[in-house]
Amino acid sequence: YDLGMNLTHLSLTTPINANWAMAVALRPYSMVDYKSSYTRQIVGAENQIVNFDNVNSGGVTRVSYVNSLRFFKDLYLGVEAAYNFGTIQKDSSSYLFGLQTNQLRNSTRYTLNGASLKLGLAYQHRLSDKWRINAGASTEISGNLKGDVLKTFGSYSDAGNGPVLVSIADTTLFSAINGTTPAQQRIGVSVESPFHWVFAADYHSTKWSNNQSIEKGLK
């Protein structure tokens, strides 16, 4: 008997009065989930290869507190304060001749946390009894991430039940790190007939050029 479940977005919204609402939300901000494998020939050994397996997992989760205010009947302003946190694990294993019995593994674990701020503005106007127009824009200010990185090197044995550490892994690096989340801007407009038709266009920009990666933020 197996039971599995994924939860990607959890939110709770409550109205304070006719012009003010608040919300809290928990959702993924960034996810890491991929594997890769490749082989290389051993120099000087004919038809002998070394295998490399890379496994990357984890991610950053965002918990948000949101306030939404209505002005002049058709104008809305939103403010989102968020806290980002999570762990990213990167494992790189190597073994000879395609046999996973004995493996050498480099492991890297990033633990991250930091705050960010997002502002939004929306306008809604009724064109007729059946049609209305909506326009909105939002900007997310680049936020800071800080935490630590732990790198280890160890020897593993695999008898068919999964890799088991042979001896205590060596710590090759433990250091504080910092980085940033990229600034983002969105703008969109739509014309709709409620519950019938929606015609929409939007633009989204993420500014990666000024973003500091966590690898460059080693202290």
Tell me the role of every PLM-derived stretch.
Residues 1-219:
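Subset of outer-membrane beta-barrel
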